[in-house]
Structure formats: C-alpha cells, structure tokens
C-alpha cells in the first residue's frame, strides 16, 4: 500500500471516584441538575485552595499498572492556561512536566501499542448548545457540574496503523477500565473521550504529511469513520501536490465529514507553569506496591485461565471474558453445575440471545442453580435438548425453576416404549410403500417415521427410544 496512516490517540478517562479531583463535590454528575454540584474550589473562586484526591491517585496507579507503565514516585501538578467559557478558572490543573506514569503499552492482537504517558487532571465544564450543530446554535448555556471531575489522560505513541486498529484499541481499553472498576468507559456519557492525531506517509516518496487532530467523536464507530475520512482527505491532497495544514478538525455527524475548527495549538500556547497551590506529590515504592496489589484479574489473564482451567476454545473464552459481569456470572454457574463446557454452550447459544455482554447479570431472574437443574433434567432423559431450550426461555423470563416449568407445561419426555411402539405400528400400517422402500435400501426414510412420532407426541418422545423401536419394527 503506497499511503499509510500514522495514528496516535489522546484519551480522557473520567475516574469513578466518590469526589472530584481537588474538592469534596460528588464526581458522578451526569444526571444531576445543571450547576448543582459545584463549590468555590471547582469554580475557581478567589482564595479557594485545591486538595488532591487520594482515590484519584489510587485509580490512576491501578490504570497505569494495567497498561504496563512505569509509575513515577515524584509527580507534580501544573497550570494549563487557556480561555473557554466552560473553564471558570481560566486554567486547567494538569500534570505536564511530571506525569503519573510513562512508557507503557497495550497488547492488541499480538502487537504492542506503546503508551507515552498517563497524567491526572481535572475536567472542564460543559457547554449546552441550542442546536445539535454548534454552527447553527443561537445560544449556549454553561453547566459547571463537570468542572473538577478527575480525569486520567492516556497519550499513545503514533503506533496505530489503521482506523480499525484505533477502534479496537479503544474497545480493549474500555474493557480494562471496566474490569478495574476505575471508570464506566461510557462514551455516550462523556466518561471516555478520544481525540486522534493522524498523518499520512507516502511510501514511494517517503514524504509525511503534517499532523491533523480530529475531535468530537463520541463513539468507537465514529472514531473509525472520522479517521477513515481524514486518511482519504489527506491522501488525496498529497496526490494533488497540496500541503496538508496542521490543524484541529471536528467530526460532523450530519455530513459524515471532518470540518476545520482552528489551527493546531503548540504546548507553549498554554504557558504551562507549576501549580503554586498544590505541593508535589511524592509516593514511596511501598505505597505504589500496596495499591498495585489490589489489581483484579485482567481480561487477558482471565481468558488464558478460562482456556486452561475450563478447557474452552479461544473463541469461547473471548466471548465469556468480554465483560467482567459476564465472566463472573459464568464462574458462579460453573461452581454450581461443575460442567464448564456445557455451561459455556448454554451461555453462548441461549443466554446471550437475550442479554448483551454488558448486562447487569446480578439482576437476572435465571440463577446458577437453574442451570444445574436444567442440565440434570437433560442428562436424566426427562427432557430433550429442544425442550430444554423452551424451558430455558421460560426460566429466564419468570425465574421459575426448570422443574416447575416442565410440570406446568407438561413437557416431560415420553419414554413409554409401549406408547411409542403403538404409534409406530400404526404408521407402518398406513405407509406400506415407505416400509417397502426402507427395506429395499432407502434408509433415509427412518426420519419419516421418527418425525411422525415426534409430531404426535408434540416433541416429547425420547428420540433415542424412538430410533431404537423404529429400527426394530422396520426389520433392522
């Protein structure tokens, strides 16, 4: 391929702390009334002093460790100075010179995407426009609730080789965030926000375009689409011999294009300097170690364990570990059923027909004991697998036990050999031509007789018993 994209991501993760980064206001503000979770600190009133959140640091360290970063014992906050209506202080408290962590990576499909740094900072407020398109808005309102909500900003190296890989990186990162419990990772709620930097290399001339920043992408799909569009735009400009401007562009959902927003800022535009109201935060290696020891099992580790301990295929383990809730519920069921493979089959073929991997499995009406009872009914021959699927659906919807459902619906397998034989004898008498054809070698007609019994018993006959009796009566 002549033209190759070079992509790096800047990802802002809202941390699930109880309070904001530097004050005691609640951090979970998504559903609150506008401007109801604010105080003199997060709105930048004169004389109000910030105090860093310990929980913010703990969550940041867990995230940095999960992303294989070197965690720095010495960190310091700085002021990033710029004007925007949703930034009441006129500056943002961030970590520019001495970040929390450096030099990490996230492994994706066997390839390492390097992480340059992770730093802690505070969020800005939120502008609410009178129109979905800012260019068409007649007015804008400011909600300061989000001011001071703690963020971890993750900056990757430009190692991402395609828009699809960028999407996959974000999906895997969100999975890790949710396993750690440090963030919901909900893009639609602003808990995970991504800006992308893209340039394009012409491999024939070894010429590389200027870097373009792309913003306003509020879903993984839109990140991929925006980068696909921008790659084509830059590539076409290079083919035409035009210079690609170094700028910030925004994804326009209505036109499925990017539009120019402003020229790209440089670091010196922000006039960074040390935050005078917060002393440096110095952590000992022992303190960092104690926090890292709280690390839960991560998705890749859990997947490997499922394959090893439960003898699952990579495909099965991938799906069952796609969310922590699903993986935990699977293990709860295996503990009761003592049958990992059968439990996996029912999760993949039945449970996930009704639930997504991100569901709250603690709230399901179907419980681990129901899986065991269902498997026992199948293994004892009281119900067939087809009937079991019907039973499963009813248990899932109502929370009744499988035995109750079987009794109420009267769908226990008919294992009475004399009844099955009676039905088959009548069929043989009514279909002498098919009996003769079968005896002359058309063995596929066995299915006709077995199917007839199943139809008359409404699927309740034991197929194994039906097969045996049919073959005996047909002379096999």
Swiss-Prot record:
GO molecular function list: asparaginyl-tRNA synthase (glutamine-hydrolyzing) activity; ATP binding; glutaminyl-tRNA synthase (glutamine-hydrolyzing) activity
One of the GO BP terms on file: translation
InterPro entries on file: Asn/Gln-tRNA_amidoTrfase_suB/E (IPR017959), Asn/Gln-tRNA_Trfase_suB/E_cat (IPR006075), Asn/Gln_amidotransferase (IPR018027), Asn/Gln_tRNA_amidoTrase-B-like (IPR003789), GatB (IPR004413), GatB_C_1 (IPR042114), GatB_Yqey_C_2 (IPR023168), Gln-tRNA_amidoTrfase_suB_CS (IPR017958)
EC number: 6.3.5.-
Domain of life, source organism: Bacteria
Alphabetically ordered keywords of this record: ATP-binding, Ligase, Nucleotide-binding, Protein biosynthesis
Reaction(s) the record says it catalyses: L-glutamyl-tRNA(Gln) + L-glutamine + ATP + H2O = L-glutaminyl-tRNA(Gln) + L-glutamate + ADP + phosphate + H(+); L-aspartyl-tRNA(Asn) + L-glutamine + ATP + H2O = L-asparaginyl-tRNA(Asn) + L-glutamate + ADP + phosphate + 2 H(+)
Keyword Ion transport: no
One Pfam family of this chain: GatB_Yqey
Known function: Allows the formation of correctly charged Asn-tRNA(Asn) or Gln-tRNA(Gln) through the transamidation of misacylated Asp-tRNA(Asn) or Glu-tRNA(Gln) in organisms which lack either or both of asparaginyl-tRNA or glutaminyl-tRNA synthetases. The reaction takes place in the presence of glutamine and ATP through an activated phospho-Asp-tRNA(Asn) or phospho-Glu-tRNA(Gln).
NCBIfam families, per the entry: gatB, PRK05477.1-2, PRK05477.1-4
Subunit structure and binding partners: Heterotrimer of A, B and C subunits.
Family the entry assigns: Belongs to the GatB/GatE family. GatB subfamily.
UniProt protein name: Aspartyl/glutamyl-tRNA(Asn/Gln) amidotransferase subunit B
Species this protein is from: Thermosipho africanus (strain TCF52B)
Gene: gatB
């Amino acid at each position: 391929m002549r033209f190759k994209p070079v992509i790096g991501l800047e990802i802002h993760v809202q941390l699930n702390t109880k309070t904001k980064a530097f004050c005691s206001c609640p951090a979970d503000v998504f559903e609150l009334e506008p401007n109801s979770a604010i105080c003199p600190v997060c709105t930048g009133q004169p004389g109000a002093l910030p105090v860093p959140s310990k929980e913010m640091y703990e969550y940041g360290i867990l995230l940095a460790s999960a992303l294989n970063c070197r965690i720095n014992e010495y960190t310091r906050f700085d002021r990033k100075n710029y004007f925007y209506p949703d930034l009441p202080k006129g500056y943002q408290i961030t970590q520019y010179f001495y970040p929390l962590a450096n030099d990490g990576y996230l492994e994706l499909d066997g390839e390492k995407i390097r992480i340059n740094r992770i730093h802690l900072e505070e969020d800005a407020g939120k502008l609410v426009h009178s129109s979905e398109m800012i260019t068409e808005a007649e007015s804008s309102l400011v909600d300061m609730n989000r001011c001071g909500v703690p963020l971890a900003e993750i900056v990757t190296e430009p190692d991402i080789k395609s828009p699809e890989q960028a999407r996959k990186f974000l999906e895997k990162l969100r999975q890790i965030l949710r396993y750690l419990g440090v963030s919901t990772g909900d893009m639609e709620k602003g808990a995970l926000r991504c800006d992308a930097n893209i340039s394009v290399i012409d491999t024939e001339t070894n010429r590389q375009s200027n870097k373009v920043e792309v913003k306003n992408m509020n879903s993984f799909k839109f990140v991929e689409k925006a980068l696909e569009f921008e790659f084509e735009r830059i590539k076409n400009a290079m083919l035409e011999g035009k210079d690609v401007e170094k700028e910030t562009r925004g994804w326009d959902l209505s036109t499925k294009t990017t539009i120019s927003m402003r020229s790209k800022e440089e670091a010196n535009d922000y006039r960074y300097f040390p935050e005078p109201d917060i002393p440096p935060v110095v952590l000992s290696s022992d303190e960092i170690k104690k926090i890292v020891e709280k690390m839960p099992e991560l998705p890749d580790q859990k997947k490997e364990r499922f394959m090893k301990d439960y003898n699952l295929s990579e495909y099965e383990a991938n799906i069952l570990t796609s969310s922590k809730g699903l993986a935990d519920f699977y293990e709860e069921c295996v503990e009761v059923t003592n049958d990992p493979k059968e439990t996996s089959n029912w999760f993949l073929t039945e449970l996930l027909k009704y639930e997504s991997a991100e569901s709250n499995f603690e709230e399901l009406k179907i419980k681990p004991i129901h899986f065991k009872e269902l498997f026992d009914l199948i293994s004892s021959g009281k119900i067939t697998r087809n009937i079991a699927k019907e039973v499963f659906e009813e248990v899932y919807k109502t929370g009744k036990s499988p035995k109750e459902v079987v009794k109420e619906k009267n769908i226990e397998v008919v294992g009475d050999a004399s009844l099955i034989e009676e039905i088959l004898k009548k069929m043989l008498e009514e279909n002498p031509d098919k009996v003769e054809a079968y005896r002359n070698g058309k063995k596929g007609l066995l299915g006709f007789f077995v199917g007839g019994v199943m139809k008359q018993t409404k699927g309740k006959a034991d197929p194994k018993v039906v097969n045996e009796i049919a073959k005996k009566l047909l002379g096999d």
